[in-house]
C-alpha cells in the first residue's frame, strides 16, 4: 500500500496543482491485525508485531514525504479512527484506561498556545485541517467542529462529554416531523 501511495503522490504532485491525498491503512484491524511477508516477528503476540510493523511503515512513509519537493507546501495529517478493539494488547488491563487514538498534524506552519491534551471529537478535524491549509470559513467553526488551532473551546470542552453525548443522541422534532414528514 505504501508503494502505491508513493507512486500516486509522485504522479499527482507532478501536475503542479493543489491536491489532497488520502490513504487508509487497515493492517492493525481487529481481531489480530494483518501480518504480511515484510512484518518482523519480534514479539510473542501477533498484534504487537502488527503495530510495530505499521508504526515503522508510517514513519518511513512520512520521512519519504519529507524528502519530496512537494513537502514544503504539504500538510500531513495522521488520524487514528479508533482504539484497537481487541483485549489482547496488554496483559495488564489497567493500561486500557490510559489508551487514546494517535493523531498528529505535521508541517502545518501554524503555532498555537493550547495544542496538547485538548478535549475534542472527530468533527473538530475538518475545521482544523482547513485552518492548516489557510482556507477561511465563517464563524468559530464548521458545523459542530471547532478548529484546534484557534484556542477557542471545542463543544466537548464547553459542554463536557456526558452533556455533549446527551445532546447528540437526543431526538429532533424538526428532523422527525419536518424532514422525515412523520406524524
Report each predicted region and the residues it spans.
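Solvent-exposed soluble domains appended to multi-pass membrane proteins
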Residues: 1-183
Amino acid at each position: 500500500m505504501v508503494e502505491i501511495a508513493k507512486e500516486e503522490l509522485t504522479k499527482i504532485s507532478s501536475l503542479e496543482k493543489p491536491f489532497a491525498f488520502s490513504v487508509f491503512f487497515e493492517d492493525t484491524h481487529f481481531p489480530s491485525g494483518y501480518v504480511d511477508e515484510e512484518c518482523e516477528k519480534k514479539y510473542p503476540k501477533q498484534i504487537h508485531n502488527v503495530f510495530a510493523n505499521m508504526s515503522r511503515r508510517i514513519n518511513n512513509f512520512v520521512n519519504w514525504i519529507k524528502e519530496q519537493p512537494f513537502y514544503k507546501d504539504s500538510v500531513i495529517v495522521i488520524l487514528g479512527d479508533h482504539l484497537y478493539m481487541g483485549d489482547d494488547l496488554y496483559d495488564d488491563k489497567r493500561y486500557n484506561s490510559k489508551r487514546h487514538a494517535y493523531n498528529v498534524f505535521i508541517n502545518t506552519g501554524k503555532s498555537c498556545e493550547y495544542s496538547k491534551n485538548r478535549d475534542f471529537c472527530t468533527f473538530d478535524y475538518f475545521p482544523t485541517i482547513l485552518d492548516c491549509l489557510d482556507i477561511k470559513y465563517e464563524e468559530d467553526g464548521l458545523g459542530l467542529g471547532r478548529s484546534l488551532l484557534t484556542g477557542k473551546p471545542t463543544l466537548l470542552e464547553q459542554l463536557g462529554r456526558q452533556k455533549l453525548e446527551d445532546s447528540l443522541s437526543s431526538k429532533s422534532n424538526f428532523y422527525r416531523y419536518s424532514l422525515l414528514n412523520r406524524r
